[in-house]
Curated annotation (Swiss-Prot):
Signal peptide: none
Species name: Erythrobacter litoralis (strain HTCC2594)
UniProt-listed CDD domains: ATP-synt_F1_beta_C, ATP-synt_F1_beta_N, F1-ATPase_beta_CD
Gene3D superfamilies xref list: 2.40.10.170, Bovine Mitochondrial F1-atpase, Atp Synthase Beta Chain, Chain D, domain 3, P-loop containing nucleotide triphosphate hydrolases
Protein name in the entry: ATP synthase subunit beta
Species classification: Bacteria, Pseudomonadati, Pseudomonadota, Alphaproteobacteria, Sphingomonadales
Keyword Calcium in annotation: no
Amino acid sequence: MATAPVLNQTTNGTISQVIGAVVDVQFPGELPAILTALETENGDTTLVLEVAQHLGENTVRTIAMDGTDGLVRGQEVINTGAQISVPVGPKTLGRIMNVVGEPIDMRGPVGADKANPIHAEAPAFVDQSTDAAILVTGIKVIDLLAPYAKGGKIGLFGGAGVGKTVLIQELINNIAKGHGGVSVFAGVGERTREGNDLYHEFLDAGVIAKNEAGEAISEGSKVALVFGQMNEPPGARARVALSGLTMAEYFRDEEGQDVLFFVDNIFRFTQAGSEVSALLGRIPSAVGYQPTLSTDMGNLQERITSTTKGSITSVQAIYVPADDLTDPAPATSFAHLDATTTLNRAISELGIYPAVDPLDSTSRVLEPRVVGQEHYETARKVQETLQKYKSLQDIIAILGMDELSEEDKLTVARARKIQKFLSQPFHVAEVFTGIPGCFVQIEDTVASFKAVVEGEYDHLPEQAFYMVGGIDDVVEKAKKMAEDA
C-alpha cells in the first residue's frame, strides 16, 4: 500500500536567480510553504528571504528582506521551516528593531523570551469589542470636528509637505506621553532622519527610560520602535508594518493592555507591495498598483482592532500622491478607518497649521450618543458656517465683500475667525515657531467654538484667534494687540 510522502520542510536549497529584491531558490526535495522564512549568508550578515510563489521545477520565488548585493547563483539557502518571527514582550520596549526583529540601536540582543510570526489571523467577530469612547488629543480641530475613537483606526491623509509627520509627532507627544500603556511606532519607508529625531525626542521626554549613565534601557520604557526606512529594499518596507503590529498584538492579547500603534507611512507599505509585485511577475492593475492591493491592505488593517482583552488604537499617516484622494492607495485605506483627518495644501498656504480640512475630515464617533448633544451641535454649526463661507468665496472674488448681505458679511467674519481659531501651536513645532505648544481640553474646545458661532466674540479682531489655545488666550491676545496699537 502506497504511503503519503513525508513533507521535508527543512531541506536546504540553492540560489538559481537574483532579480533585484526577488531571489529564486531551487530545492531538491519538498518545497517550503508560502510565507516560510529562508536564510542565506551574505558576507558577514544573514539575509532573510520570504517565500512568495511556487514556480514549478522545484523552484520557489522569494522576497529579500535586505539588500541582495553579493548573492551568487549556487549559494546555499537554509529552510527554517517557519515564518519570519519577531521578538515580542516587555524586552522590546525602548529598543529599535528592523523588519526581522534584529536590534539596530547598537545595544546588543533584544533578549525577549518569546518570538511571534508576523503573519497572523485577524481576531474573530465574537472577540471584537464595539465600545465607543473618545480619545482626547488636545488638538482643537480634531477633537471638535473629527474626534478619534479609543481603540479605533485613524488615518492622516495629505500630500507631500503638508504636515503629516509633524501631526503624528504631536499626537505621540499628547497621547503617548500621558498614556499609561505601551506604544509601538512603525516607520515604514520614511526618512531615517525623522526616525532618529523621534527616538531622541522619546529619550528626552522619558517615554524611553534611561539608566544613571544616561543610556536607554527597556525597564520603564513605554515604546518599541520598528523601522524599515526609505533606503531599505521593498521586501523590508512591505513587511515592517506587520512586524510592528505583531509586537502591538502581543501587548493587547497576552497582557490585556490598551496599545497605541503609530504607522508612518501606510502608502509606503502599498508602494513596496507594488515594487515587489512587478518583480514577481504579476500583471499590474489601476495606476500600476499590484492586483492584490485590497487584499494586502485588508490583511494588515483587519488585525488592527480592539478585542475583549485589550485595544489597539492606531494612527496612520497616509501620503496622497499628487494630492489626489481618488488614487487607489489612499482610496483603499478609507474603507478601513474610523476617523479620517485630511490635510489640505490650500489651508497650509494660508499659514494655518495644523492644515486640517474641517469639511473633508470625518469621524464615526461624531454623533450625539458618543460625544453628547452640545458637542455635536457645535461641530455641525462650525461646519455649516465654514461651508457657507466656502460657497460665498466665488461671489467675494468676483464682486467683493460689499455686495454681500449683512447676514452673509457676518457669516464670513465668523467663518474667518473660526478658520484662524482652528490653528494651534504644537509642542513639537515650538523650535520652529517660537510659540509654546498648547493642549486644549475637549470641554474648553466645545465651549470656545460654541461662543464664537453664537457671536459672543464678534467684537474681537480675527488676528487674535490665530495660533492660540482656548478662548481665554484669544481675549488675552486681543487685549495685548489693543495695547500695542
